[in-house]
Amino acid sequence: MIAKLTGILDDTGPDWAVIDVNGVGYLVHCSAKTLTHLGLRGDKVVVHTEMQVSETDQRLIGFTSAGERAWFRLLTAVQGVGSKVALAILSALSVEELQRACAHGDSAMVARANGVGPKLASRIVNELKDKAGGLAGYASPVGPGGEAFVAPPGNASADAVSALQNLGFKPAVASSAVAAAVKELGEDAGLNDLVRVALKRAAG
């Protein structure tokens, strides 16, 4: 099972990207939002992946964050939602918007996605409403260079994200600012330094 790819963005298409990992090109199918976040050819990227295998096909699906992948898994567990429809939904809505739509029963928002009619949108919202709260903490921030950033719990990065949120910054803004601070200061930076630099990034 391939769970994550770290490499160079080699090529992109309407709904796919090729990630070069040590000379091996992996074809990854992605949502429009993921493709936008990946950046330009030659950029270093980190892509979370889900492998789908059927009798006639096997493919890698790519995501900017573990949260987006978690929602993809939930969506494809709903009857009538395959990988194509799930990616269409994730192209139309951010992880935060999808979580909010399911939590509030807003099927009209889900129906904005291509290929999703009112009946299917209602089924998705009804089946995932109770599960939406469990994924409320997931965001899809993207750090410098198009790399998704998820702060591991219990370390200085996670504490810095929490500190910025306590100061009133939105989760995605806080996470992106801390990602930039980590890139500038290094992964061993202390909490105070991370918060100081992240505050400048978030405010600027």
From Swiss-Prot:
Task: Name the Gene Ontology biological process terms.
Answer: DNA recombination; DNA repair
Q: Where is this region: Domain II?
A: 65-143
Question: Any idea what this protein is called?
Answer: Holliday junction branch migration complex subunit RuvA
Q: Which family does it belong to?
A: Belongs to the RuvA family.
Q: Which organism is it from?
A: Novosphingobium aromaticivorans (strain ATCC 700278 / DSM 12444 / CCUG 56034 / CIP 105152 / NBRC 16084 / F199)
Q: Name the gene.
A: ruvA
Region entry Domain III: which residue ranges? 154-204
**Its quaternary structure?**
Homotetramer. Forms an RuvA(8)-RuvB(12)-Holliday junction (HJ) complex. HJ DNA is sandwiched between 2 RuvA tetramers; dsDNA enters through RuvA and exits via RuvB. An RuvB hexamer assembles on each DNA strand where it exits the tetramer. Each RuvB hexamer is contacted by two RuvA subunits (via domain III) on 2 adjacent RuvB subunits; this complex drives branch migration. In the full resolvosome a probable DNA-RuvA(4)-RuvB(12)-RuvC(2) complex forms which resolves the HJ.
**Where is region (Domain I) located?**
1-64
Alphabetized SMART domains for the sequence: HhH1
Q: Which keywords belong to this entry? A: Cytoplasm, DNA damage, DNA recombination, DNA repair, DNA-binding
Primary localization: cytoplasm
Look up keyword Cytoplasm and say if it applies. yes
